[in-house]
Amino acid sequence: MKIFFVLLFLLASLSQLAVAVEKEFSEEQISKKRQSFTLAVLPDTQFYCDTRLKLSEKWGNGDLRHHFFEQTRWVRDNQKRLNIAFLVHEGDIVQADAPEEWAIAKEAMSILDGHVPYCLCLGNHDMGFQKSNNKYGGDIAVNRTTHFNKYFPREKYAQTKEFGGTFDPKRHDNSWYHFDAAGMKFLIVSLECKPRDEVLDWANKVVAEHPEHRVIVLTHAYMRAN
């Protein structure tokens, strides 16, 4: 019987605590905390931008760029219905770092501009292309050169409220963004493919400066084979 009364007392105390906690927040804050939201993710769109090696064409799939446009258009058109707070692209944006491929990617991603905030990270297909006699017609990621910054320039994204900063003040490769959703603060750290130690040091500092944020690390590949 004593156990029953103790449990009853604890339950009553907890219910009063819950009411007291809720009173500390406004109705608007409580509503936001209970609200669901969506984080949209785009992975590996390289075959939608396959103009240099034309592997998709060789394998019988043809020009697939319309899929890229349809995907970002769908995200834009469903932003309100799904409360899409942010979109991340996980890299391998293009097939072989060709300017015409980046032009396709730019057109597709620009559909989101002014509707859904987004950020991107680089994959191995997005950098360091070099022609070769292999079965694909070229090697990728032989170095870190990329056309990404021409088509997704830092100065454009620095104008958005979600933009936080970059590792290199002149480049957009390694960046951080932030957004609020469901009463929570989020920090996205976008890292290059197989990030260098100095980039990781920078990322750690960014995270340390935002102790109240939930952190999302966005990268196409974190570890090197060796």
Residue ranges and their predicted role:
Residues 49, 95-97, 127-131, 224-226:
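Short catalytic/ligand-binding loop motif for oxyanion handling, primarily in non-cytosolic enzymes
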Residues 32, 71-86, 168-173, 178-180, ...:
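His/acidic metal-ligating clusters that form di-metal
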Residues 57-58, 98-201, 210:
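Extended active-site neighborhood of metal-dependent phosphoesterases/phosphodiesterases
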Residues 19-100:
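N-terminal active-site segment of His-dependent metallophosphoesterases
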Residues 5-15:
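Bacterial N-terminal signal peptides
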Residues 41-43, 85-92, 117-123, 190-191, ...:
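Active-site neighborhood of phospho(di)ester-bond hydrolases with catalytic His/Asp-centered motifs
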Residues 42-48, 71-81, 96, 108-115, ...:
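Structured segments of extracytoplasmic/periplasmic soluble domains
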